[in-house]
Regions:
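Secondary-structure boundary elements
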Residues: 158-215
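Hydrophobic/aromatic-rich core segments of domains that either
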Residues: 225-300
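Periplasmic OmpA-like peptidoglycan-binding domain that tethers envelope proteins to the cell wall
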Residues: 217-224
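Sequence-level motif detector for i,i+2 pairs with an aromatic at +2
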Residues: 146-148, 188, 264
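A short, structure-level motif marking secondary-structure boundaries and short turns
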Residues: 103, 214-217
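N-terminal accessory/pre-domain segments preceding catalytic cores
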Residues: 2-182, 299-414
């Protein structure tokens, strides 16, 4: 005969008591019809999440209208225009989350390529979001069978540092504005920004070199910092400008530059290379006192620039073809053919105007080679040097030369 286990009776007794209490509570709180309504309402309220699997935050995001332009009116958002409707919604969600400095937030996009493309568009359109990590340092959480994700951009600075950097950027806007005369056209504004960036910063790798923070705060940056700062200042002055990333011929390193719009035409703008006097071949590069601004990269000849730099295929960029706003063209220093007397007269005119640097450019390789044979390998410069001594009453003068081969330009520094 099997023994009965007393704990089974205890369990049954407790279960019966629990049922009784439950019925009692139910009877005390609700009538049967009321309870049915309460349960029904709960199911209806949560039906979208129950059946779609989406959190309430995601469903709210999908209901929001997508603004066609920057809600703060700060940027032209060139790359936003190249996104499809779904991507544009994700673009706005990313900007809202970053501006609020949220550590993580939902996106209604989720595929890796899509999130990466949209985030890249945000970064290139918005240099003012300097406190966010680049796209190699973000984290994304996806969910099984879900078409949304949790995005964690990561931030580079404390709130105090962000305030310091923004104050430095605001100060830069005021300083560059002071360089622009009232009624200045867009080319004059572009030249002022180009000159300001080169005079302000040094090309130098640092922890802050990938954004405008490096330029305005640390005064050191690489191409990404220069291009972001240029975009920030030019858009502040009302000059249409976009940020461009691409590759460098003969190098594994990428490069960043800008494209600006002047009088309806598009031009390259590369302040990084303008701040690279070591690009010059010749003894002038050894002169510490000569930090020569290379204006060759302010509206350069497109075919010359494109021999070295190619934009990424991820997005399309405007085609540049005009040469009329090139620095040398505007200053009558670009020549289609070589004539010694013509070049000498140009040098004398520049020296008469007080120039310490004389530069001249050629539109053809043949003319450039002829000039190099006379002015670099020959002694054509001697006549210009004698003219310089006559102007300043000197018995001797020291001069140095530089050549920018890819731009077919010759420099002399007195």
């Amino acid at each position: 005969m099997r023994k009965r286990k007393p704990w089974k009776f205890i369990f049954i007794l407790l279960f019966a008591v629990a049922i009784s209490l439950g019925v009692y509570v139910y009877q005390q709180q609700y009538e049967p019809d009321d309870l049915f309504v309460k349960v029904g309402e709960g199911i209806l309220d949560n039906a979208p999440e129950i059946f779609s699997g989406e959190p309430k935050e995601v469903r709210e995001l999908r209901k929001q209208e997508v603004a066609d332009t920057d809600t703060q009116g700060l940027r032209q958002e060139y790359y936003f225009g190249q996104l499809n409707e779904e991507e544009q919604r994700g673009y706005r969600e990313i900007i809202e989350g970053i501006r609020a400095k949220e550590k993580e937030f939902y996106l209604t996009i989720y595929e890796d390529d899509t999130v990466n493309r949209v985030y890249h568009a945000v970064l290139m359109d918005h240099p003012e979001l300097f406190w966010v990590h680049n796209r190699k340092q973000v984290y994304k959480t996806t969910f099984s069978n879900a078409n949304y994700c949790m995005f964690s951009p990561g931030y580079s600075y404390t709130d105090e540092e962000i305030q310091e950097i923004q104050a430095a950027a605001d100060n830069a806007c005021q300083e560059v504005s002071a360089l622009v005369s009232e009624g200045a056209d867009d080319y004059e504004k572009a030249k002022a920004v180009y000159t300001y960036l080169i005079d302000t910063a040094e090309y130098q790798e640092s922890e802050d070199d990938q954004s405008m923070a490096g330029i305005f705060w640390r005064r050191q940056a690489v191409c990404a910092g220069y291009a972001g700062a240029a975009q920030y200042l030019l858009e502040y002055l009302g000059v249409p400008c976009i940020y461009v990333e691409g590759s460098t011929a003969g190098s594994t390193e990428g490069h960043a530059w800008n494209i600006i719009t002047l009088n309806g035409n598009d031009y390259y703008f590369d302040a990084t290379n303008g701040d690279q006097p070591e690009f010059l071949e010749g003894d002038a590069v050894q002169l510490a006192e000569h930090k020569t601004i290379l204006y060759d990269y302010l509206c350069p000849f497109p075919e010359e620039y494109e021999m070295t730099y190619t934009p990424s295929a991820e997005f399309t960029v405007p085609a540049c073809s005009a040469t009329d706003m090139n620095f040398d063209v505007l200053n009558q220093g670009c020549f289609d053919s070589y004539d010694y007397q013509e070049i000498l007269a140009y040098c004398q005119m520049r020296l008469n105007n007080g120039a310490a640097v004389v530069r001249f450019k050629f539109s053809s390789q043949e003319a450039f080679e002829q000039a190099r044979a006379d002015w670099i390998n020959g002694d054509a410069i001697q006549e210009a040097a004698r003219y310089y001594m006559t102007i300043y009453g000197m018995s001797q003068v020291e001069y140095h030369y530089g050549i920018l081969e890819n731009m077919k330009t010759i420099y002399y520094m007195f």
